Amino acid sequence: MIHELSGDILFSGAKAIAQGVAPNDDFLHGLALQLRERMPAMYKDFRHYCQTRHPKSGGIWSWMSADGRYIVNLFTREAAYGVGSKPGHAKLNHVNHSLHELSDFIQKEKITSLALPRLACGLTGLDWNEVRPLIDKQLGDLRIPVYIYANYQKGVKAIEPPK
């Protein structure tokens, strides 16, 4: 079941948090920056992965924290190539492909709940009315609660329905 909530995704009790990024992203804004600051080991491992594997847009990369929670980075944006270059914009086909991979990952790892923000609708400029149907299509049949943090409220813990 998919639920739209207001609150701070960092207070979510979900077993996995997903976010949209670019391959080689520097995590300088929004949720990515907050995760980079709270989990520097995740960011270090992400950078190493990108430098050694050269991931493509439309894929995912996951990381498990010490408390057993997954952070799943969805490559929704065009990559940042070259030192100091900025990531490109998000594209709907990248969002769709990465959500499909996320669905497969959730089933494979038996993840019991997922939280994600309004993917690719912040700095990257996609229209939520085009992104939300992709989430419904790719994640709607999962038999777990999926929490979309549609309205960010810093420091506010949302009430997450169990299903």
Question: Where are these predicted regions, by residue range?
Answer:
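Macrodomain-like recognition of ADP-ribose-binding/processing modules
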Residues: 1-163
